[in-house]
Amino acid sequence: MKKLLLFTVFFTLIGQASEKSINESWCSDQGGFTEHRTSYGTYVDCLTEDLAIEVEYDYNWKESIGQALHYAEATGRSAGILLIIRNKSNVNYLEQLNAVINKYNLPIKVFVTNE
């Protein structure tokens, strides 16, 4: 029984992409650099020529707004968010994120990728 449980947990974990691996692949495709350290000691997930991008799973969309704006200020670039939509998401977090951005006219560009 323990072997079956361990086997199940192992394959569940390898089936889920990590935020870091998604960021590395996506950021590279955009011509950006990952984990850029700011003068504040914080790390931008993906820094491109024009954008400082926070990469976050959909359920953490609220936190991504503040981080994206902070990274933009720290780098002098525009703010961006890469929202990772999880396969098991039952809530439209992208809709919620866009509602806040639009209501307050926040200068954030949103990108979406699937898990």
Predicted regions and their residues:
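Sec-dependent N-terminal signal peptides
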Residues: 3-13
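Short, flexible loop segments at the rims of nucleotide/cofactor-binding pockets, characterized by
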Residues: 31-33, 56-59
